[in-house]
Amino acid sequence: RNGIGRLLLTTLLDQAEASGFHGVIARIEASSASSRGLHESCGFKLVGIEREIGRKFGRWLDVAHMQCLLHERASRA
């Protein structure tokens, strides 16, 4: 792991905040601990899960909805 995902995500959040966005929503595969961990470390919080909403390689997947309110992210620093 070389931190490219974290760099991309933090850059996206910085740009969203600079552009006047209030928040950002991510939809990720719920069982992906690494993706959830990355998003949580960048200020996202889990706000809901849709069960068996998508299929991949012949199996049903849950989708996690994560939200980052940018003003809360800024106050963490």
Regions found by a protein language model. Name each.
Residues 25-28, 36, 40, 45-62, ...:
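Conserved catalytic-core motifs of GNAT/GCN5-like acyltransferases
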Residues 1, 28-29:
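A short, internal acetyl-CoA/4′-phosphopantetheine-binding micro-motif in the GNAT/acyltransferase core
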Residues 76-77:
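Flexible, glycine-/basic-rich loop-and-beta segments that form/coincide
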Residues 9, 69-73:
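Acetyl-CoA-dependent GNAT
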Residues 1-18, 23, 36-41:
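Conserved acetyl-CoA-binding loop-helix of GNAT-fold acetyltransferases
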